[in-house]
A protein has these predicted regions:
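Conserved beta-loop-beta element that borders a ligand/cofactor-binding pocket
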Residues: 13-38, 51-53, 62, 67-69
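Aromatic/hydrophobic pocket-lining residues that form π-stacking "cages" and hydrophobic walls in ligand
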Residues: 16, 56, 117
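C-terminal substrate-binding subdomain of Rossmann-fold SDR/epimerase-dehydratase oxidoreductases
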Residues: 59-182
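Active-site helix of classical SDR
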Residues: 4, 8-11
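Active-site "substrate specificity/gating" loop of NAD(P)-dependent dehydrogenases
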Residues: 41, 45, 73
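Active-site loop-to-helix junction immediately N-terminal to the catalytic Tyr of the SDR YXXXK motif
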Residues: 2-4, 18, 44
Length: 182
């Protein structure tokens, strides 16, 4: 998301590599893509894109609104992975990978924020218009990781984006009991 976050991730990778080389431990750095799933944060002030869009679509549907507003142009592309798939991938990596280089954990597919908003609106059942707030930032044009190392190990995600979003929406609907919905 920002320069300092990226620097911290790189520092963590380098620390694992150095510790592995110095002490002979089988440390592996796994770099996950954007994750979503059960127990997510649906507070619009602090949530990431998927839970924010789920909440916006739900509130638009529940209030009978004719439109749902999304940030920016909708053109940036993002990759997403369900948290359960990430956990599965990490177990697979622990069983099949022992290299010095970090390994990316992702779906290998991306879509635009507008396509994501349309998919979420469909899953939620909101049939109104999606409107762009061009006063809000787009962010980086594209974030898609290379999943070649993980694919070579024979791992593929098991949860489609639509299926995962439907599960996330079910989680949102029951989340207020856990305090996840502000």
């Amino acid at each position: 998301t920002n320069q300092w976050y990226a620097i911290a991730k790189i520092a963590g990778i380098k620390l694992c590599q150095a510790y592995r080389r110095q002490h002979g431990n089988d440390f592996i750095s796994a770099m996950p893509t954007n994750l979503y799933g059960p127990g997510d944060n649906y507070d619009l002030a602090s949530s990431h894109v998927i839970p924010a869009l789920i909440r916006k679509a739900h509130e638009a549907k529940a209030s009978g609104a004719s439109q749902m507003i999304i940030w920016g142009s909708g053109s940036p592309r993002r990759e997403f992975l369900h948290a359960d798939d990430c956990a599965d991938a990490l177990v697979h990596i622990l069983k099949t990978y022992s290299e010095d280089q970090h390994i990316n954990v992702g779906s290998g597919a991306d879509l635009t924020i507008l396509e994501l908003a349309q998919l979420i609106a469909d899953v939620v059942g909101f049939h109104g218009q999606i409107v762009h707030d061009l006063t809000k930032p787009d962010g980086t044009p594209r974030k898609l990781m290379s999943g070649d190392r993980l694919a070579a190990l024979g791992w593929r995600p098991g949860i489609s984006l639509r299926e995962g979003l439907a599960g996330a929406y079910r989680d949102f609907l029951t989340g207020d009991a856990r305090g996840n919905v502000a």
